[in-house]
Amino acid sequence: MDELIKEFDRYMDLERNLSTHTRKNYLSDLNQFKIYLEENHRVPTELKTEAWQNVDYMMVRAFLGALYRRRVKKVTIARKLASLRAFFKYLHQKRKIQCNPLEAVSTPRTEKYIPAVLSVDEIFVLLNLPFPEDVFGLRDRAILELFYSSGIRVSELTGINEEDMDFSQGLIRIRGKGKKERIVPIGQPASEAVQRYMMKKPGSETSGKAVATCPVPLFVNRRQGRLSARSVARILSKYVSMSGLQKQISPHTLRHSFATHLMDAGADLRSIQELLGHESLSTTQKYTAVSVNRLMAVYDRAHPKARGGH
């Protein structure tokens, strides 16, 4: 990898505290741009500082144009542009380049993203399935209950350790994006589901003794290793198929449903922002749009004037 990209990655890790997932996206986007420069602008394979110095805004615009022609989604293009902005801003601040070519490139408008959500009835269909009573069935129930009860991200769920659970207070310590910690409440059904799982989980009885030296993952696979995000998605997919719900449902759908149902019940945006671990309130505001859309749908179905009645 190019040395300056490596430096930028270290900066994002140590000084900006960005998550591994975000840094991986940055590196992927920057390496894609690097390959584009090599193939289309005869920039040397081993990019040096001088080569980055020669990148101008026309090259960046041509790269974005190539993405548009390949019909890459606008939201993905916007993310790639954000990666380039962060990288060239870093190079400019560190005086690796004299001019920042991204200052002349405007950000494209993206479609307003409104997340998919499940209704409360659909959530109950999923959570009331007959889960197996072995340790893995108990684990799977605990995972689904915890997702809907707390609204955490899949990366946060897989990162939970046994010592992060405070059953007496009904709280979990969560390590979120940018390695930031927050405390999240969970409801009684989720708390009980996790405790039933832990009672059958191998080695869980002695986990308290191991806390000081080595964190004990809460959710584990058959080899007692920490469950991966991909495995969690597969587990959810299995139960969605069993439920008969004809929808694409991911772990993030449960997070969106959690937030939207709180909004529907009258929770304020600031509280939802804190629960979800959003840095910006504008990120949380998309749930307002979901709630308004749902409200309008109910109005259209129920109000006589909406149906053209007299």
From Swiss-Prot:
Segments forming domain Core-binding (CB): 1-92
GO biological process, one term: chromosome segregation
SUPFAM superfamilies listed in its UniProt record: DNA breaking-rejoining enzymes, lambda integrase-like, N-terminal domain
Subcellular location: Cytoplasm
Entry's Gene Ontology cellular component terms: cytoplasm
Broad class of the protein's primary localization: cytoplasm
Keyword Repeat assigned: no
GO molecular-function term, one example from the UniProt record: DNA binding
Pfam families: Phage_int_SAM_1, Phage_integrase
Cross-referenced PANTHER family: PHAGE INTEGRASE-RELATED (PTHR30349), TYROSINE RECOMBINASE XERC (PTHR30349:SF77)
Protein name: Tyrosine recombinase XerC
